[in-house]
């Protein structure tokens, strides 16, 4: 994985969250997966292990991509964002780029993605 910056998510108990001045976001599910340790081991360069992570998170949450309103996804390269959107079930395989091309991923679009600009905006 290419990494050039960091991020943080602060997780608190329901009791602490209730004492905060902002409305909390509840974590309904999580998933993590690694498909290979180096690119030479990849059998399919059009797929990522995000599909496995998504499957696990959706199962834990009892939800699916149609239940989400927006997403923040890893975007080390432009193609990474499009492929990850496909692996998360947000677009059919080979069609992830259309979320951006057609404006659906933009703030105010049908399914906003990386409304903070994503990692690529930090260069």
Stretches with model-predicted labels:
Residues 48, 52, 56, 66, ...:
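Feature representing long, continuous alpha-helical segments
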Residues 64-69, 93:
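Short acidic capping loops at alpha-helix termini that bridge into adjacent secondary structure
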């Amino acid at each position: 994985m290419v990494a050039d910056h960091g991020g943080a998510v602060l997780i608190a108990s329901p009791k602490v969250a209730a004492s905060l001045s902002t409305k909390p976001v509840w974590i309904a599910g999580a998933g993590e997966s690694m498909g290979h340790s180096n690119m030479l081991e990849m059998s399919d360069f059009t797929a990522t292990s995000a599909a496995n992570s998504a499957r696990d998170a959706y199962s834990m949450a009892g939800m699916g991509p149609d239940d989400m309103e927006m997403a923040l996804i890893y975007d080390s390269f432009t193609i990474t964002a499009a492929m990850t959107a496909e692996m998360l079930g947000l677009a059919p395989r080979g069609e992830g780029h259309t979320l951006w091309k057609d404006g659906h991923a933009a703030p105010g679009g049908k399914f906003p993605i990386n409304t903070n600009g994503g990692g690529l905006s930090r260069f």
